Amino acid sequence: MPRRSRGSRQTILVIEDDPVARADLQARLKAQGYTVALAADAASALTVVNRERPDLILLDLGLPAGDGFLVLERLRKIEVLAAIPVLIITGRSDAETRKRVDAMGLAPVLAKPVSTEVLLAAIRSALETPPG
């Protein structure tokens, strides 16, 4: 998926079920000039990603009605969506979660709570890295 030109605002989809965390991420990203789309669960996430075609997805793994891994699996099955970079942001730190994340080639995993500096560095890196 081609990146938007430097003159246009990049869109980040925040998929987070906790309304406080979702609003916090939205505020921090908007303050940096990003356009922010929001989803609170797996079903709405897939609808929003199809509609918005974001430049990057921030994905919480602990979602109601299908976890973040389900969202990832569905995204990767749709060619035009599979190239969208995904950053995992999660409070999970168990070995099974780490194993699944590693197997999917997802890095870095941003541990909650994530500082603005770490968040923005990860976003910039992901947006500058060519797909594939």
PLM ranges: what are they?
Residues 16:
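Conserved acidic carboxylate
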Residues 41, 67-73:
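Acidic catalytic/metal-coordinating carboxylates
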Residues 1-13, 117-132:
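Non-catalytic signal-transmission and effector/linker regions of two-component phosphorelay proteins
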Residues 70, 93-110, 121:
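Alpha4 helix (beta4-alpha4-beta5 surface) of REC/receiver domains from two-component response regulators
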Residues 52-58, 63:
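Active-site beta3 strand of CheY-like receiver
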